[in-house]
Each structure stands twice: as structure tokens, then as C-alpha cells.
């Protein structure tokens, strides 16, 4: 069964209920951002895709993906 993408951040704001939905927490998300040198305020959209990988766009419209 394929999973649907789940939005985790929008315009620098964490969507806490969606983190709970995917069995993650804010500490996990902050660690992911720190490891990749990202700041919450620079994230336009960040989501967990159907393959359980993080995909995001920054305010500069840079698309990146990582596990």
C-alpha cells in the first residue's frame, strides 16, 4: 500500500499534528534540519514523501531531498 505525502512544515512553521501522524517529533525534525544546515525560517515547504524521504523547498525555491 502506497503512502501519501505528509506536509511537515509550511512557511517556516512546523505542523505538529502531522509529525504525530507519521510517528515523528520536533526533536527529530530539528535534528534533520541541523544536519543539513537548514533553518526553519528558510523552509517554504517540507514534507515526507510516499517513500518516507524528506523533500523540501526553501524560500529561494531550491528543491532538495534526503532521507
What is each model feature region?
Residues 1-67:
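Terminal domain-initiation and capping elements
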